[in-house]
A protein has these predicted regions:
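Cysteine-nucleophile protease catalytic domains, especially the papain-like/related folds used
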Residues: 1-45, 117-124
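Structural recognition of the beta-strand scaffold that forms the well-ordered cores
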Residues: 25, 46-49, 83, 93-95
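Noncatalytic regulatory segments and standalone regulatory/sensor domains
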Residues: 41, 54-81, 85-124
């Protein structure tokens, strides 16, 4: 199972408010590569949805029946969520919960990010 940006931002905001923090999370789905770079320059890492190996998104294997809409959903089988932590020319630094901090090709990252719907959350 997984979720995308909106419920992550909502959950983060509930937690931040409960902690008395002035920080807030925002669903910035649709942000451009330039927009991501602006958040990073401002010191704000960004949670992004990509694939495990920056390959094209794949679906299949099963279907989900969404209880609230009755729709059938075919889930991604290689979906992954990481924190975009830096950008230096042709490479991006991501904090990957499976592989730790690593550098990836910026063009491949952006292509995958766009293919996954440019989904992102920033906390600032």
């Amino acid at each position: 199972f997984y979720c995308f940006a909106q419920p992550v931002a909502q959950g983060a905001n509930a937690y931040l408010a409960a902690q008395g923090s002035a920080l807030r999370a925002a669903d910035i789905t649709g942000v451009t590569g330039q927009g991501l770079l602006q958040y990073l320059r401002g010191g704000d890492p960004v949670i992004v949805w990509i694939t495990k190996d920056l390959s094209a998104p794949r679906t299949g294997g099963c279907t989900w029946l969404l209880a609230d809409t009755g729709e059938t959903y075919v889930p991604y089988v290689n979906l992954h969520c990481v924190v975009l932590a830096g950008w230096d020319g042709d490479t991006c630094t991501i904090a990957d919960p499976l592989q730790g901090r690593r550098r990836v090709d910026a063009a491949a990252f952006l292509q995958c990010f766009r293919q996954m719907g440019s989904r992102a959350v920033v906390v600032h």
